[in-house]
Amino acid sequence: MYEYLHGLITAVYPDHVVVDVNGVGYLVNTANPYRYEVSATAVTIYVYQAVSDTAQTLYGFSDFAEKQLFLKLINVNGIGPKSALAILANPDHQGLMMAIKTNDTGFLTKFPGVGKKTAGQIVLDLQNKLDDLAPATDDNTLFTPEVAPTTTENPQLADALAALTALGYRETAVKKITAQLRQFNGQTTNDYLSEGLRLLTK
């Protein structure tokens, strides 16, 4: 079982990154792949390895606190790794924990794959189990901002929309916020993705 990987990001996709560790490329599913960039500088990604009869899957996190929150979420009945990643994609982890503590199921049902029953289960299982967990933060120190192109075809926006779909948000919901995102003055894919998540969960 792996605790973390330390290596080079060699590729970034809407739902995962590839981490090269001593010449071996690891496919790591992350809540926000565009937090990272292809770089010659090594990064550390905390990981959780899920093993099934058909596959071994790695899930990656920006810090230990985010990993701990993920582990708590997947222990809730009805929440799998993919749903947990979709929840963690919203960078406001402190707001997430506050929603759980205050029984704000309306906030929780805004995440893909979380209905009223599952939201209630999250509150029931975790309401009194988060006090020992420091809020995970959206660490952007590993990401170097890029200047968004001025053409109508914005690759950063396109990548962010693809990432939202990969997280499980319905295509109709993503389309509804696309016009607002086009008006958003984002610099990077991470900017557009964070704003998209804010719009989808407000």
UniProtKB/Swiss-Prot annotation:
Residues 1-62 are annotated as: Domain I. Residues 63-141 are annotated as: Domain II. Keywords: Cytoplasm, DNA damage, DNA recombination, DNA repair, DNA-binding. One of its GO terms (molecular function) is ATP binding. One of its GO terms (biological process) is DNA repair. Its main location: cytoplasm. Residues 142-151 are annotated as: Flexible linker. The keyword DNA damage applies. Residues 152-202 are annotated as: Domain III. SMART domains: HhH1. It is found in: Cytoplasm. One of its GO terms (cellular component) is cytoplasm. Homotetramer. Forms an RuvA(8)-RuvB(12)-Holliday junction (HJ) complex. HJ DNA is sandwiched between 2 RuvA tetramers; dsDNA enters through RuvA and exits via RuvB. An RuvB hexamer assembles on each DNA strand where it exits the tetramer. Each RuvB hexamer is contacted by two RuvA subunits (via domain III) on 2 adjacent RuvB subunits; this complex drives branch migration. In the full resolvosome a probable DNA-RuvA(4)-RuvB(12)-RuvC(2) complex forms which resolves the HJ. Belongs to the RuvA family. The RuvA-RuvB-RuvC complex processes Holliday junction (HJ) DNA during genetic recombination and DNA repair, while the RuvA-RuvB complex plays an important role in the rescue of blocked DNA replication forks via replication fork reversal (RFR). RuvA specifically binds to HJ cruciform DNA, conferring on it an open structure. The RuvB hexamer acts as an ATP-dependent pump, pulling dsDNA into and through the RuvAB complex. HJ branch migration allows RuvC to scan DNA until it finds its consensus sequence, where it cleaves and resolves the cruciform DNA. Has three domains with a flexible linker between the domains II and III and assumes an 'L' shape. Domain III is highly mobile and contacts RuvB. NCBIfam families: ruvA (TIGR00084). This is Holliday junction branch migration complex subunit RuvA.
